């Protein structure tokens, strides 16, 4: 209960978990090992959603008296700030490892939890080192300073394998997409848009033109080195709620120009494309490629690249009318990205919490809500498919590709690529 009560208090969260704390009429704890959730409506995703939350120790923060009544959370007190979890005494959980030391920008050291309730992990100590630059990260692996690295650069695969190391990779549930401002109007209220007196992204024809202008396969092959999959919806097949017939929009620059002309932009317009340059695989390069493709159809596109921390702060303040970002669906089913990215933004319900373009479609919202309260799995999956098809037909955002996530490992250990892109110490194991 303490965990659920704290979630709405977390400041500056780029992707808040508040959507998972809605809809509870009551939460009861009849004994120390039982928790009973009473919801206002059927909630088929409740166990799945709760599994994404890290459970906090109420005792560590003096929150043992907290309760959840008809009015929501009661007796929370002063919840901890995120920075407090950098202290081992506060980072209390029931997992296979314990936090031994955290030094910002240098390392995180975990030690095996000898009192763990499950199988003991293989490693006595695990050290995580943040190495943001690709070159030093690869060099650390080749020198034997580290055993595993995330996201080795594609161009270094041959060098890494030639030195006797392994590459493992697999498709992820992370969609890379372009989002457009579908809220502000006229143009002077639409940041970065020039050459028009209105917001062009409010016109579906403009959004469709942008989609047709993007050569997704060229991005996959030339920018991503084949280590990505072109996207036609928000999750890759065969995850729950996806449709095999939802193919990527075909590259059609002439069709895109025609749509722009029909929308009243025969000479195009100008826009700034915001992007992080250190968050997603080749993010700035992908943004530059997309900008060139849009410029070719008459939308002069200038790229504004920056660190992820700066980008997300500016994005959350709606400073971009067009931006590149990514979304990973932790739940592994279509409800997650539909709720997060294309449902109408509603702080009261948590719907649309990452819909920074503020697209709104009541018909789509109704389908999403119906799917969210449908317990029958087959019926729910069909509703999600309908919602996905409706959304993609209206171009609320432009799906580009799904990341294929690589890891590089030394010989003698194994790791199986995860669709959620997580690197878990418990799943790195000795082996050939």
Predicted features, each with a name:
Residues 1-16, 26-30, 38-45, 85-91, ...:
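Extracytoplasmic/periplasmic ligand-capture domains
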Residues 17-75:
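Surface-exposed binding/hinge segments that line
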Residues 48-49, 334-336, 410-413:
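Short conserved micro-motifs at the rims of enzyme active sites and ligand-binding pockets
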Residues 58-59, 80, 395:
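Extended, small/polar residue-biased N-terminal targeting/export presequences
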Residues 61-64, 226-246, 405-410:
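Mature extracytoplasmic/periplasmic domains
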Residues 73-81, 85-86:
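Residues embedded in well-ordered regular secondary structure
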Residues 400:
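Glycine-rich and polybasic anion-binding loops at the starts of cofactor/ligand-binding domains
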Residues 407-432:
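Long beta-strand-rich cores associated with HINT superfamily self-processing modules
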């Amino acid at each position: 209960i303490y965990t659920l009560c704290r979630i709405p208090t977390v400041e500056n969260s780029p992707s808040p978990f508040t959507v998972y704390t809605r809809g509870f009429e009551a939460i009861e704890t009849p004994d120390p090992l039982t928790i009973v959730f009473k919801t206002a409506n059927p909630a088929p995703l409740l166990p799945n959603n709760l599994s994404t939350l890290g459970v906090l120790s109420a005792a560590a923060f003096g929150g043992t008296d907290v309760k959840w009544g008809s009015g929501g959370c009661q007796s929370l007190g002063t919840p901890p700030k995120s920075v407090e979890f950098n202290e081992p005494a506060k980072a209390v959980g029931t997992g296979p490892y314990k936090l031994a030391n955290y030094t910002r920008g240098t390392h995180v050291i975990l030690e095996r939890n000898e009192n763990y309730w499950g199988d003991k992990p293989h490693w006595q100590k695990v050290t995580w080192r943040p190495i943001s630059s690709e070159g030093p990260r690869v060099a650390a692996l080749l020198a034997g300073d580290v055993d595993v690295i995330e996201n080795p650069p594609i161009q270094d695969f041959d060098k890494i394998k030639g030195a006797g190391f392994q590459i493992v990779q697999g498709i992820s549930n992370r969609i890379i997409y372009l989002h457009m401002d579908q809220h502000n109007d006229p143009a002077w209220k639409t940041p970065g848009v020039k050459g028009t007196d209105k917001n062009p992204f409010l016109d579906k024809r403009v959004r469709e033109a942008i989609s047709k202008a993007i050569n997704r396969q060229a991005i996959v092959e030339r920018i991503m080195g084949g280590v990505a999959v072109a996207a036609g919806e928000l999750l890759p097949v065969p995850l729950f709620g996806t449709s095999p017939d939802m193919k990527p929009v075909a590259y059609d620059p002439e069709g895109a120009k025609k749509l722009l002309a029909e929308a009243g932009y025969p000479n195009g317009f100008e826009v700034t494309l915001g992007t992080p340059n250190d968050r997603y695989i080749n993010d700035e390069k992908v943004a530059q490629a997309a900008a060139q493709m849009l410029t070719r159809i008459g939308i002069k596109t200038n790229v504004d690249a920056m660190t992820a921390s700066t980008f997300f702060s500016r994005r959350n303040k709606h400073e971009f009318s067009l931006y590149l970002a990514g979304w990973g669906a932790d739940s592994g089913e279509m409800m997650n990205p539909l709720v997060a990215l294309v449902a109408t933004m509603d702080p009261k319900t948590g719907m649309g919490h990452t819909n920074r373009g503020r697209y709104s479609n009541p018909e789509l919202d109704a389908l999403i809500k119906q799917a969210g309260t449908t317990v029958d799995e087959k019926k729910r999956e069909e509703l999600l498919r309908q919602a996905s098809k409706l959304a993609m037909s209206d171009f609320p955002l432009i799906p580009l590709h799904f990341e294929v996530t690589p890891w590089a490992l030394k010989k003698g250990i194994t790791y199986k690529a995860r669709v959620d892109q997580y690197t878990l110490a418990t799943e790195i194991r000795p082996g050939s």
